[in-house]
A protein has these predicted regions:
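Electropositive, glycine- and tryptophan-enriched low-complexity nucleic-acid-binding patches
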Residues: 91-92, 96-109
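Extended C-terminal regions of large enzymes
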Residues: 351, 356, 360-427
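Non-catalytic, polymerase-adjacent accessory regions of viral genome-replication enzymes
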Residues: 1-45, 49
Length: 427
């Protein structure tokens, strides 16, 4: 494919219109100039021709990204770089033209940030490899990958495919556009900031070199962005692969392997893309399930959504719970979790009973509502005036009967087990 005149494809009306719609659809925060995504259309109507001419003549200068620090579950910090909405628009237009070119080069076992690919496909591929006798895992952790990408190495790799100097120029400009941290400018000497529309593609272009090396060595692997695992048949092979691939990553790609987090392990000790793995002796196969840390995060969020002090209606809590439940099940539906869903359903009902009990407020109102729900008068008044804590009362048999599973379902609450069974079919 001729890649010597890509800038005109990038600046075509059709491509720019698609980029505009995508940026507006994605919404997103303001960059350093404070412009909102809702203002992009008016801005382009006034300045679009000037921007296009600047891109053609290599005079366009991207603005620095705005640094945003996001806490990680392990206590660390993930640095995001928020470009201006104009730069997001230009990056999106570039990515739309470059992506089909690189899709022809990317490895079939690369699943992150690619069209029509997802984390679930990566998990299913990994399971196939594990169940084919490759049950020793090389789990390689790249230390601050997006913050440490070597610009020269990346541009050299891009230059092997892209021959349009205008495109090469603007991509490099985005890499070195700088970072604003609390109104202080900082040069971006290395890295491709997470948050830009080009960053996922650039990450895959860099790490495709790793994919090619692993393919050349005949290794079984799956990669989702910078999260890569390799599956081999023995512990000795796994340790050898860990040494050799780590050396390649650091010496050839200029990246850093976090040897503290990288490890050789069996599937049972692996956490990958939120999934854990276990061996099912009934079918003599490894299977996936939500990892214990993913379950803990679910429970934490579920408690937040059913917090008794959250000053919203119970119907609103149920609505938000349902959204969260559906999203979580849709992500983990390829895993085995019927028993887990039953347990979590019980936890959710228990939390909602506490919310409803608090919502009734006074003992008199509680007794009145219990009687409406067919609790005998003597039991209703005994429970309403007993003074027990919410947590204990939520386990009370009469309250469980009054605020039953059937009644909570009639309020619109989604059953995790039912939704999981419906989404995963016969699993």
């Amino acid at each position: 494919m001729d890649t010597s005149s890509l800038m005109e494809q990038i600046l075509s009306s059709d491509n720019l219109n698609i980029a505009y719609l995508q940026v507006v659809r994605n919404k997103g925060a303001e960059g350093v100039d404070g412009m909102k995504y809702t203002e992009l259309g008016e801005h382009l109507a006034k300045n679009g021709k000037i921007i296009k001419e600047q891109l053609r003549t290599r005079k366009y200068k991207p603005q620095p990204v705005r640094r945003v620090e996001i806490p990680k579950p392990d206590g660390g910090i993930r640095n995001l770089g928020v470009p201006t909405v104009t730069d997001r628009f230009i990056q999106q237009a570039i990515a739309q033209v470059l992506t089909p070119i690189y899709e022809e080069q990317f490895h079939d076992h690369s699943y992150g940030f690619r069209p029509n690919r997802c984390a679930q496909q990566a998990i299913l591929t990994a399971l196939d490899m594990m169940n084919d006798g490759n049950d020793w895992i090389v789990d390689i952790d790249l230390e601050k990958f997006f913050d440490t990408v070597n610009h020269d190495k990346l541009m050299t790799i891009i230059g092997r495919t892209i021959k349009d100097g205008d495109v090469i120029s603007i991509v490099r400009k985005y890499l070195v556009s700088g970072i604003m941290i609390d109104d202080e400018y900082e040069d971006s000497i290395v890295g491709t900031p997470q948050g830009g529309n080009l960053s996922p593609l650039l990450a895959n272009i860099m790490l495709n070199e790793l994919d090619k090396e692993m393919e050349k060595r005949g290794l079984n692997f799956v990669r989702y962005a910078d999260d890569c695992i390799i599956m081999v048949g023995s512990e000795m092979s796994a340790n050898r692969v860990m040494r050799n691939i780590s050396r390649f990553i650091e010496e050839k790609l200029g990246l850093k392997v976090n040897m503290t987090k990288s490890k050789v392990d069996r599937p049972r000790g692996l956490k990958y893309l939120g999934f854990g793995f276990y061996f099912d002796p009934r079918v003599h196969q490894f299977k996936a399930k939500p990892h214990a840390k993913s379950v803990a995060k679910f429970k934490k969020r579920m408690k937040e959504l059913t917090c008794r002090s959250w000053g919203v209606s119970n119907s609103y809590k149920v609505e938000k719970l349902n959204q969260f439940i559906r999203g979580w099940i849709n992500y983990f539906k390829i895993g085995s979790m019927k028993t887990l869903c039953r347990e979590l359903d019980g936890n959710i009902r228990y939390r909602l009973r506490m919310c409803i009990w608090k919502h009734w407020k006074t003992p008199q109102n509680r007794a009145k509502n219990l009687m409406k729900l067919d609790v005998p008068r003597w039991a209703a008044f005994k429970i309403a005036y007993c003074g027990d804590r919410y947590a204990r009362l939520a386990h009370n048999g009469w309250i469980q009967k009054a605020i039953s599973t059937k009644r909570l379902t009639s309020f619109g609450l989604v059953s995790m087990l039912d939704y999981y069974t419906e989404r995963c079919g016969t699993c």
